[in-house]
Swiss-Prot record:
This is Heterogeneous nuclear ribonucleoprotein K. The keyword Cytoplasm applies. It comes from Gallus gallus. The gene is HNRNPK. Keywords: Activator, Cytoplasm, DNA-binding, Methylation, mRNA processing, mRNA splicing, Nucleus, Phosphoprotein, Repeat, Repressor, Ribonucleoprotein, RNA-binding, Spliceosome, Transcription, Transcription regulation. It comes from the Eukaryota. Residues 16-34, 249-258, 295-305 have a biased composition (Basic and acidic residues).
Amino acid sequence: METEQQEETFTNTETNGKRPAEDMEEEQAFKRSRNTDEMVELRILLQSKNAGAVIGKGGKNIKALRTDYNASVSVPDSSGPERILSISADTETIGEILKKIIPTLEEYQHYKGSDFDCELRLLIHQSLAGGIIGVKGAKIKELRENTQTTIKLFQECCPHSTDRVVLIGGKPDRVVECIKIILDLISESPIKGRAQPYDPNFYDETYDYGGFTMMFDDRRGRPVGFPMRGRGGFDRMPPNRGGRPMPPSRRDYDDMSPRRGPPPPPPGRGGRGGSRARNLPLPPPPPPRGGDLMSYDRRGRPGDRYDGMMMQCHVDACDDMQPPELFEGGSGYDYSYAGGRGSYGDLGGPIITTQVTIPKDLAGSIIGKGGQRIKQIRHESGASIKIDEPLEGSEDRIITITGTQDQIQNAQYLLQNSVKQYSGKFF
């Protein structure tokens, strides 16, 4: 199991740009361990608007990359705001290609030279994450220090896939060096379990996987993606800069149009039954910072309004269940409280997970057209919020909220207000 250390963010704090000679020798040995002749595949998650920069007019740019570097380079089309750049070559060649591509991306075109901060999102199979993190986070810490980059490994897989996003930020040369080392690390480890590569046509605003589907900070001149803490102590990802609408084959967020086929049914979700009241409010607005939150009894029940159960598990273990079996049948709201022992957010206190069941006809008032409302609630609360699809024959949807107690209460308050404002109902 991945350790809590993966949730820490280490940055290089040295300011003089110099390191002891023995450290430099160690770093060089670390770099030279690569098998540079081995052909590997790199997949980078891009905004759709940047596909044109990679492809070029009439395919000029991508043809030049293929010819000049004798590599396989492709950016398949998609109907959403994301595309996947795929490069197959040896690691050194991949590095040279990335150095050519990064300055052409829309966010960085206005910079001269290579002295600017950038970000790339690498896709890896979920079973390879442990090889990047290392024992007690030692490997990812070493990577950050040796390459002078910021690395964030997202915990949630991309929609309907086994891929996870590794977000790498820093100077272009440093980011490329870090990616090359990661490619070597993962090429040494076989993939375990089934493999379902991410198809960007299935992107989903309600997944918190590190993609380009949340509100971006549009300020230029600095890398985005590390401003807040989110699920499990990870830094929260930036929201969407792209202007592309959702693909018409996907459901829209007002629940007015059909989706492209049902997603794979999540295991462990059947059998929950019982009527659920629809006129009970979410918990009250958050108290002043430092004030007491609602008390939970041994069954995780604040007062008598909620029917739930206490989950004594690490938040990472809870998240690894797909989704966690947290509820029992009964009347009233299903509510759970998961203690995230040892995992802390910037606002203080442990990272915990709460789930609330709502009538599915109220989901549109929370999500909004194109996911705008749910994005805003995530942004304002700092919490990770995921809305599950309703089970077949069910009239309910489950909202999973992860964060500190303050973040969760803020999110609940904003969700409640959104329903009141846009549906005229109160749940």
